[in-house]
Amino acid sequence: MDDAVGDLKQALPCVAESPAVHVEVLQRSGSTAKKEDIKQSVYRLLKRHNIVFGDYVWTEFDEPFLTRNVQSVSIVDTELKAKDPQPIDLSACTIALHIFQLNEEGPSSENLDEETENIIAASHWVLPAAEFHGLWDSLVYDVEVKSHLLDYVMTTLLFSDKNVDSNLITWNRVVLLHGPPGTGKTSLCKALAQKLTIRLSSRYRYGQLIEINSHSLFSKWFSESGKLVTKMFQKIQDLIDDKEALVFVLIDEVESLTAARNACRAGAEPSDAIRVVNAVLTQIDQIKRHSNVVILTTSNITEKIDVAFVDRADIKQYIGPPSAAAIFKIYLSCLEELMKCQIIYPRQQLLTLRELEMIGFIENNVSKLSLLLSEISRKSEGLSGRVLRKLPFLAHALYIQAPSVTIEGFLQALSLAVDKQFEEKKKLSAHV
């Protein structure tokens, strides 16, 4: 128990003078090296690079042992709360090493037989999953959403391990992310599950992520739906019983399950729908008592969620469309990737928004392209994160169609793709 509490203390934000720095070590899938040997080699690597600037990744190593056994060493999450990257003196920090290997099997389906039908009720991943690698870093938000969610879950686990009386201080291990479609709510839930599995790898051997298909749990015979919910949660309970696993239950578009109560009151749904709502709430109440489970939920239509469900959520976080500043970061990461793959060639240095601020947004040879990207970001406001990540592909497909392009040519194409996106939205709205 003391070791578990110690792991959690290390993973929580450090209040002491010596700040905690999290270092994620991705061990190669074929490697059988002992974690202790990898740990010592990584410590030597960090000693050789005493000062780093913000988040930093090593993929090439001087030591042959690291080259054979480690894919990457990453200093992570130093920029979640700081507005800008800061220099970090590793010798003055408490290093929290998290060594992990990715599961490459992909998702499996959890089926529930309902008479002659075979209902896919959930998708199931063993974490950390290769499918979600890099997802956390790709999600850009204006406020400290990611750090708040990390801190929340770490605190719930610490309170459980310290045996805090839940009758005196209540926490439910339920997170609700709400906001318009396409803002990355589901992706954030999956990325959070992956991040926590890695961060607590010394405490739990692996993670389990169950994404419940809330639409499938509604049988066309409402009287059967309550039974399906119970069946589904019985399978989840089996996973929770393994105390070496950290279990995440993701219920996407939770309003489709919980809106039934209000519809029933209005006479629009059969009374059996109430049983489904009650079954969901009862099952959540049962599994949330376990210290190794976190329930993650999303909703596109907040006002349609059952009040009894909303009350159970400890954190109700709104996830809105990205601001111009967040859009700039998203586009910048896309351009970096295209330059790395030499679709944009030759490579050119782009300034960050902070660097543009420092020079007063004055246009010169160094800042010209970055200012153009800033302008494109401003006119992209109103588009969802999902659409923004597609736009570089659409820009190339619609306006370039060549193996490589200069960054000037690509930015022109990106600007046209943004204009086209708003035109299409306008046409769709006119026909709705």
Swiss-Prot record:
* CDD domains listed in its UniProt record: RecA-like_Pch2-like
Gene Ontology BP term (one):
reciprocal meiotic recombination
User: In this chain, where does the modification N-acetylmethionine occur?
Assistant: M1
What is one cellular component GO term in this UniProt entry?
Answer: male germ cell nucleus
Q: Name which cysteines form disulfide bonds.
A: none
Q: Could you tell me which Pfam families the record lists for this protein?
A: AAA (PF00004), AAA_lid_TRIP13_C (PF23242), TRIP13_N (PF23563)
- Where along this sequence does the record place binding of ATP? G179, P180, P181, G182, T183, G184, K185, T186
Q: Do you know which InterPro entries this protein is assigned to?
A: AAA+_ATPase, ATPase_AAA_core, ATPase_AAA_CS, ClpA/B, P-loop_NTPase, Pch2-like
> Gene3D superfamilies, alphabetically?
P-loop containing nucleotide triphosphate hydrolases
Which key words tag this protein in UniProt? Acetylation, ATP-binding, Differentiation, Meiosis, Nucleotide-binding, Oogenesis, Spermatogenesis
Q: Name one GO molecular function term.
A: identical protein binding
What is the protein's quaternary organization? Specifically interacts with the ligand binding domain of the thyroid receptor (TR). This interaction does not require the presence of thyroid hormone for its interaction. Interacts with proteasome subunit PSMA8; to participate in meiosis progression during spermatogenesis.
Give the protein's function: Plays a key role in chromosome recombination and chromosome structure development during meiosis. Required at early steps in meiotic recombination that leads to non-crossovers pathways. Also needed for efficient completion of homologous synapsis by influencing crossover distribution along the chromosomes affecting both crossovers and non-crossovers pathways. Also required for development of higher-order chromosome structures and is needed for synaptonemal-complex formation. In males, required for efficient synapsis of the sex chromosomes and for sex body formation.
Q: Which family does it belong to?
A: Belongs to the AAA ATPase family. PCH2 subfamily.
What is the name attached to this protein's record?
Pachytene checkpoint protein 2 homolog
Specify the species: Rattus norvegicus
